[in-house]
From Swiss-Prot:
Subcellular location: Cytoplasm
Residue ranges, annotated region (Disordered): 691-710
Record's keyword annotation contains Nucleotidyltransferase: yes
Protein name, as recorded: Polyribonucleotide nucleotidyltransferase
Residue ranges constituting the S1 motif domain according to the UniProt record: 623-691
Organism: Vibrio campbellii (strain ATCC BAA-1116)
PROSITE patterns linked: KH_TYPE_1, S1
Recorded name of the encoding gene: pnp
């Protein structure tokens, strides 16, 4: 029934990787099962043979899904099945998409869908690298026009050494978590988080990862040759040279002038006018003219005009030189009731950022295939349509918003205090209120400012900068602080975040081959200068965390009790701690080692909660006098509560100096009395006395003094 499967096994660092095709999903255009040391991912590729007529974009979809059965688990929740993609799945899908998208021919508009399903997971091998390898292999054997294959590698930096594909355990000790993907000759994508590494260390890691992944590319090429799928009979549509020439005649000179308008919306209005004029002329000449084709050629002409001007050394679209950063405006404390806030403006890009402090109970619980963990630092990025002067749908975050938020979080993570140093959950929200390039890096700057404004003791300020590149032949120009148009029309988007001493995050997407180590070095060095300039302006506004947190933020007080006393504070069915929180208006968290964290916006409430917990956990001391409350009467005496949850017996003979016939003649339930602790027996029973707690008459005291010779 089955043809013999094609299997390719190769060594990749310390891991054994196997590629297999020919058994599963035979109706897909291509399908590969990739296994890396018990982590297995099944990748399918389906491409449509025909493009939708008139379609002017490439409809590539990448879906990445983790099945809980891969880790031997059953999903939680009511429905007991996987639902919408998690944030982690969305980020991995973007990680796969970014390096493969530039490798399809520009004119290829056929729909392609990649679906990667994690079907087995080794807790020490993250699925993202094998998924990228499997995607590359599936596309390589599909016959679809694809200028791959690509390789992928994770690089760690442990004890000063670069490590290929470190395990999850090793990553905990690593100063770097970097993923690099590329073809045999070029790096295409970098995604990383670092602990203040230098530019040289980061570049070495990128080059190391690219060198090591050549083993993957070689293996996929051999796998492709063995599968021997015929290439699609696809030819790029012939260019309409007559229309290209006509549009250039009509619009080129006008576009050159339009791109000298420095204000974004005014420039867009003028370009829109020019496009309308071109359409009007061409449709008058030929009412059947293809408006989508006209639009595509017009856009290509825009790209040519801008790139040619930059390569020629002319000022950029907004009049800046290549290494200039736009005008900065930095403000903190802009919102009165938030715990921390900032407004960071760089040219026509602006972020309103808030920081909110919560208790550890507010931490996000993340249920991953490799286990459950808590995240005490949350960063959410919102990109509403008004920030670019448009209308649009407002709802749950899109892939781009999730990706940009994660990048900003990576940039800040290295300077965040540990939970032991700062026992709060911190949530940052970046609202992009204006956008013209690099809003994610504006979010990094705004986050650093808002955290300091909130009193979060971050180790240092962090700033981010986006770099761009225009390359024509051997000529190239590296641009600092790119505009949205420069990002769109350029060859590279290179985002760097860091402190004055090093890099904390690096993200790179390259659209062309031929980006050398030297070009990346120039970009990193230029980014360093821009980053330090931004940091100097930020430090003028606020250079360190405020001494105190906001009056509106919960203040966390920490105390320690014996672990044996935890059950007393919690009470039966949680009754005691529930009463404590409700009556004092505090939030109380108890850890297994007896550490108690009390969060309250008012100091008096926290003090009251601490006092009551101390009472609950206090030990009864022999010889000490307590003010207790009569809990219950008995024929032989009375039970008196001396501490919360701790009763003792006052025997009838210990109620008064004279003989007591009936306990109720002297005591009633609820009455407050002074009692002295006489004894605590081996079973923990407390014996009390009222008569011993009563002060002796003055003459007895004097007799006692004389007896001592006073």
């Amino acid at each position: 029934m089955f043809e013999k499967p094609v299997v390719k096994t190769f060594q990749y660092g310390n891991h054994t990787v196997t590629l297999e095709t020919g058994v599963i999903a035979r109706q897909a255009t291509a399908a590969v099962m990739v296994t890396m040391d018990d982590t297995a991912v099944f990748v399918s590729v389906v491409g449509k043979k025909e493009a939708v007529e008139g379609q002017d974009f490439f409809p590539l979809t990448v879906n990445y899904q983790e099945r809980t059965y891969a880790a031997g688990k059953i999903p939680g929740g009511f429905f007991k099945r996987e639902g919408r993609p998690s944030e982690g799945e969305t980020l991995t899908a973007r990680l796969i998409d970014r390096p493969i998208r530039p490798l399809f021919p520009d004119a290829f508009k056929n729909e392609v869908q990649v679906i990667a399903t994690v079907v087995s997971v080794n807790p020490d091998v993250q699925p993202d690298i094998p998924t990228m390898i499997g995607t590359s292999a599936a596309l390589a054997i599909s016959g679809i026009p694809f200028n791959g294959p690509i390789g992928a590698a994770r690089v760690g930096h442990i004890d000063g050494q670069l490590v290929l594909n470190p395990s999850n355990t090793e990553l905990e000790a690593s100063k770097l978590d970097l993923v690099v993907a590329g073809t045999e000759s070029a790096v295409l994508m970098v995604e990383s988080e670092a602990d203040n590494l230098t530019e040289e260390e980061m570049l070495s890691a990128v080059v190391f990862g690219h060198d090591q992944q050549q083993a993957v590319i070689k293996a996929i090429n051999e796998f492709k040759a063995e599968v021997a799928t015929p290439a699609w009979d696809w030819v790029a549509p012939a260019e309409n040279t007559a229309l290209v020439t006509k549009i250039a005649e009509l619009a080129e000179a006008k576009l050159v002038e339009a791109y000298q308008i420095t204000e974004k919306m005014a420039r867009y209005d003028r370009i829109h006018e020019i496009a309308g004029e071109v359409n009007e002329v061409l449709l008058a000449e030929d009412p059947e003219a293809n408006t989508k084709e006209i639009h595509t050629i017009f856009h290509d002409l825009e790209k040519t005009v801008v790139r040619r001007s930059i390569i020629a050394g002319n000022p950029r679209i907004d009049g800046r030189e290549k290494d200039m950063v736009r005008a900065l405006d930095v403000r903190t404390g802009v919102l009165p009731r938030t715990h921390g806030s900032s407004l960071f403006t760089r040219g026509e890009t602006q972020a309103l950022v808030t920081a909110t402090l919560g208790t550890q109970r507010d931490a996000q619980i993340i249920d991953e295939l490799t286990g459950e963990r808590k995240d005490h630092f949350l960063l959410h990025y919102n990109f509403p349509p008004y920030c670019v002067g448009e209308t649009g749908f407002v709802g749950s975050p899109k892939r781009r918003e999730i990706g940009h938020g994660k990048l900003a979080k990576r940039g800040i993570a290295a300077v965040m205090p540990s939970v032991d140093e700062f026992p709060y959950t911190v949530r940052v929200v970046s609202e992009i209120t204006e956008s013209n390039g690099s809003s994610s890096m504006a979010s990094v700057c705004g986050t650093s400012l808002a955290l300091m404004d909130a009193g979060v003791p971050i180790k240092s300020s962090v700033a981010g900068i986006a770099m761009g590149l225009v390359k024509e032949g051997d000529d190239f120009v590296v641009l600092s602080d790119i505009l949205g148009d420069e990002d769109h029309l350029g060859d590279m988007d290179f985002k760097v975040a860091g402190t004055n001493t090093g890099i904390t995050a690096l993200q790179m997407d390259i659209k062309i081959e031929g980006i050398t180590k030297e070009i990346m070095q120039i970009a990193l060095n230029q980014a360093q200068g821009a980053r330090k300039h931004i940091l100097s302006v930020m430090d003028e506004a606020i250079s360190g965390a405020r001494e105190d947190i906001s009056e509106f933020a919960p203040r966390i007080h920490t105390m320690k009790i014996s672990a044996e006393k935890i059950k007393d504070v919690i009470g039966k069915g949680g009754a005691v701690i529930r009463a404590l929180t409700e009556e004092t208006g505090t939030t109380i968290e108890i850890e297994d080692d007896g550490t108690i964290k009390i969060a309250a916006t008012e100091g008096a409430a926290a003090k009251e909660a601490i006092r009551r917990i101390e009472e609950i956990t206090a030990e009864v001391e022999v010889g000490r006098i307590y003010t207790g409350k009569v809990a219950r009467l008995a024929d032989f005496g009375a039970f008196v509560t001396v501490l919360p949850g701790k009763d003792g017996l006052v025997h009838i003979s210990q109620i008064a100096e004279k003989r007591v016939e009936k306990v109720s003649d002297y005591l009633t339930e609820g009455q407050e009395v002074q009692v002295k602790v006489l004894e605590i027996d081996r079973q923990g029973r407390v014996r009390l006395s009222m008569k011993e707690a009563v002060e002796k008459p003055a003459e007895e005291a004097n007799d006692a003094s004389e007896a001592k010779g006073e």
